[in-house]
Amino acid sequence: MRSSLIAAIALVALAGCGRITPATVTDPAEVQRLARITVPPSAAGLQCRTECGIDPLIYGRFYIPTADLRAVLDRMPKDCKIEPYSKYSNVTSHQMSEPWWQPGQIREPQVAEWSEPGFSVNLMFGEAGQPGILTVYFFNFGL
């Protein structure tokens, strides 16, 4: 009897060690709430996933007309600046498994990164395809 109980506990523990597929978020309002960024009504191609580990994580991508970038950055603190990408960003330092996660395809990427109490916002954006359309990647997490 005792060996059956130990085997059952071991089986449950091993089942919990498998890879869990990140949850998909499709509602722009929910993405805004979780990522703490604005997703403009003009956004297209929204992809978003969440993971819960030691720190909650939300990452994704969408396309916007260049003129709508200001709306995406509306929560950025005034003392933060848009910077040219200098070969490091929380966006590019993480290799996500989704086929749409390709920040390396952005030409002349720029980044905007800031923290607020208990949360880090990390954006990378630039043109990757059609002129006048920006691809915006975000990789945001709890601290």
Regions found by a protein language model. Give the residues of each.
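C-terminal motif of bacterial Sec signal peptides marking the signal peptidase cleavage site
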Residues: 13-16
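N-terminal export and membrane-targeting signals
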Residues: 1-9
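Extracytoplasmic low-complexity, Pro/Thr/Ser/Ala/Gly-rich segments
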Residues: 20-69
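Mature extracytoplasmic domains of secretory-pathway proteins
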Residues: 51-112
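Short, low-complexity, Pro/Ser/Thr/Gly-rich segments in the mature regions of secreted, periplasmic
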Residues: 129-143
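Short, exposed beta-strand-loop hairpins at the edges of beta-sheets
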Residues: 114, 120-131
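Short, surface-exposed beta-strand/loop "edge" segments at domain boundaries and coil↔beta transitions
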Residues: 69-71, 113-115, 121, 141-143
